């Protein structure tokens, strides 16, 4: 299977660089994965597509203010993208610099000195030397790390709009974007309908934006992310399945978490790393339907939805979305695949 099979041409004006005024004002393309039928809806119509016996699974990870700035002792400018916090003083980060800083050297992260402990590929391990920890630095100086395709600096509203309304556990470098469409009001409507809700956690890494760089999909090495699926969530899933309801994953991060926890065929609690790569030919054991945004060409995420719904049906849905001028990517519109 070729990576080029998952390419498509997207007019640049369809990339959503800004969110709509209201979260739930986006559009929703409804795709029947059995028949291939495509229907155009408003996102608020989603309430009509779910039943009381269904279970919605959301990713409650919160985006870190992960973009920071600093300099070398020489004064040369540095830009950081914090990838993962190991302890309050030790963290993994990408560093953008004219010349890569050396292992063992000291550099400034904002106003605080840090030592470079290790380097692995493009990832550095830093230890802060001052009184402040990385959480304090992010809180004081940090910027929302908008995806590169938005081609703009973050603005004040992004701190709210690039987070889901239910975000709780700090740790992501990118938003679990399918959840951005859910307003407080829509969450209340779901509860009022009697549809149950559960939360998993997957801390999204910057690898989510990385295009697949090998020609053969089978040779792609997936990046690793930290997930948590509790026994309470597993029990809700078992009950939902037993009662004939559907497990509806909100976003590909929820899909990957649930399918990691369900790799044996049965859902089990899971805490740790996942590098699960779902592409056509892979089986889904847990998820029955999903909400997801429109994904970048040749990305692992367009491969995931193609595995779930059949590649030809997905590509036809994307063609339809482009023709109908849907908005694409993180701040864009969504699909309901069932």
From Swiss-Prot:
Pathway the protein takes part in: tRNA modification; tRNA-queuosine biosynthesis
Pfam families for the chain: Queuosine_synth
UniProt GO MF annotations: S-adenosylmethionine:tRNA ribosyltransferase-isomerase activity
GO CC list: cytoplasm
Keyword S-adenosyl-L-methionine included in the entry's annotation: yes
Enzyme kind, highest EC tier: transferase
SUPFAM superfamilies to which the protein is assigned, alphabetical: QueA-like
Keyword Thylakoid: no
Origin: domain of life: Bacteria
EC number(s) from the headed UniProt entry: 2.4.99.17
Localization of this protein: Cytoplasm
GO biological process: queuosine biosynthetic process; tRNA wobble guanine modification
InterPro entries: QueA, QueA_dom1, QueA_dom2, QueA_sf
Catalytic activity: 7-aminomethyl-7-carbaguanosine(34) in tRNA + S-adenosyl-L-methionine = epoxyqueuosine(34) in tRNA + adenine + L-methionine + 2 H(+)
Annotated family: Belongs to the QueA family.
Assembly information from the UniProt record: Monomer.
Record PANTHER family: S-ADENOSYLMETHIONINE:TRNA RIBOSYLTRANSFERASE-ISOMERASE
HAMAP family, alphabetized: QueA (MF_00113)
Protein name per Swiss-Prot or TrEMBL: S-adenosylmethionine:tRNA ribosyltransferase-isomerase
Phylogenetic classification of the source organism: Bacteria, Pseudomonadati, Pseudomonadota, Gammaproteobacteria, Thiotrichales
Gene transcribed to yield this protein: queA
């Amino acid at each position: 299977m070729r990576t080029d099979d998952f390419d498509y041409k997207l007019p640049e004006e369809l990339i959503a660089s800004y969110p709509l005024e209201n979260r739930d004002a986006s559009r929703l393309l409804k795709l029947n994965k059995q028949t291939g039928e495509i229907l155009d809806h408003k996102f608020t119509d989603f309430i009509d597509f779910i039943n009381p016996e269904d279970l919605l699974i959301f990713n409650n990870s919160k985006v870190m203010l992960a973009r920071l700035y600093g300099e070398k002792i020489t004064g040369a400018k540095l830009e950081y993208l914090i990838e993962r916090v190991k302890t309050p003083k030790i963290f993994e980060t990408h560093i953008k610099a004219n010349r890569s800083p050396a292992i063992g050297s000291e550099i400034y992260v904002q106003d605080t000195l840090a030592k470079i402990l290790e380097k692995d590929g493009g990832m550095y391990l830093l230890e802060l030397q001052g009184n402040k920890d990385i959480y304090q630095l992010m809180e004081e100086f940090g910027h929302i790390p908008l995806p590169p395709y938005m081609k703009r600096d973050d603005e004040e509203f992004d701190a709210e709009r690039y987070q889901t309304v239910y975000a709780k556990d700090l740790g992501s470098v990118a938003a679990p974007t399918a959840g951005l469409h859910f307003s407080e009001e829509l969450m209340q409507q779901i509860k009022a309908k009697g549809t149950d809700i559960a939360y998993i956690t997957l801390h999204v890494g910057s690898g989510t934006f990385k295009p697949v760089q090998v020609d053969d999909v089978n040779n792609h090495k997936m990046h690793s992310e930290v997930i948590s699926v509790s026994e309470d969530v597993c029990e809700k899933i078992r009950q939902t399945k037993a009662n004939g309801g559907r497990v509806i994953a909100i976003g590909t991060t929820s899909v990957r978490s649930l399918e990691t926890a369900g790799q044996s065929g049965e859902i089990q609690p899971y805490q740790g790393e996942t590098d699960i790569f779902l592409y056509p030919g892979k089986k889904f054991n847990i998820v029955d339907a999903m909400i997801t945004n429109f994904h970048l060409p040749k990305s692992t995420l367009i491969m995931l939805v193609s595995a779930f719904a059949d590649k030809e049906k997905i590509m036809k849905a994307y063609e339809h979305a482009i023709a109908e001028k849907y908005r694409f990517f993180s701040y864009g519109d969504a699909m309901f695949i069932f």
